[in-house]
UniProtKB/Swiss-Prot annotation:
Organism annotation: Mantis religiosa
Name of the protein described by the UniProt record: Periviscerokinin-3
Top-rank taxon: Eukaryota
Single GO biological process annotation from the record: neuropeptide signaling pathway
Keyword presence, NAD: no
Chief localisation class: secreted
Length: 16
């Protein structure tokens, strides 16, 4: 899903 992807992405981007 996009909604879940955006939320997880926001936390995954800085972590990467």
């Amino acid at each position: 899903g996009k909604t879940k992807g955006v939320t997880s992405g926001l936390i995954a981007f800085p972590r990467l």
